[in-house]
Curated annotation (Swiss-Prot):
SUPFAM superfamilies xrefs: Urease, gamma-subunit
Protein name in UniProt: Urease subunit gamma
Oligomer status and interactors: Heterotrimer of UreA (gamma), UreB (beta) and UreC (alpha) subunits. Three heterotrimers associate to form the active enzyme.
Molecular function via GO: nickel cation binding; urease activity
CDD domains, per database record: Urease_gamma
Biological-process GO terms, alphabetical: urea catabolic process
GO cellular component: cytoplasm
Pathway annotation from the record: Nitrogen metabolism; urea degradation; CO(2) and NH(3) from urea (urease route): step 1/1
Length: 100
């Protein structure tokens, strides 16, 4: 299986998101990389489902709450930016203050 560097990055991101999802389901608080991975993967999947950039910017703020991450993590993540593929091309989605 030959993967491009972009495809390898997406695969790594989704693997990290799966780990984060499982830890969250067990009641563990997520750390910085886990929180970023979970939010990013949800944005990518939302784009694949046909949501708009504006919808994803709002949706990105609903994925995690302050209670689901370790202390100080919300302040460490002022925004999350991810390039997502939409039907009309690749666009940068920015989620400001993703953990409230």
């Amino acid at each position: 299986m030959d993967l491009t560097p972009r495809e390898k990055d997406k695969l790594l991101l989704f693997t990290a998101a799966l780990v984060a999802e499982r830890r969250k389901a067990r009641g563990l608080k997520l750390n910085h990389p886990e929180a970023i991975a979970l939010i990013s993967a949800a944005i990518l999947e939302g784009a694949r489902d046909g949501r708009t950039v504006a919808e994803l910017m709002n949706y990105g703020r609903t994925i995690l709450t302050r209670d689901e991450v370790m202390d100080g993590i919300p302040e460490m993540i002022p925004d999350v930016q991810i390039e997502a593929t939409f039907p009309d091309g690749t666009k940068l989605v920015t989620v400001h203050q993703p953990i409230i």
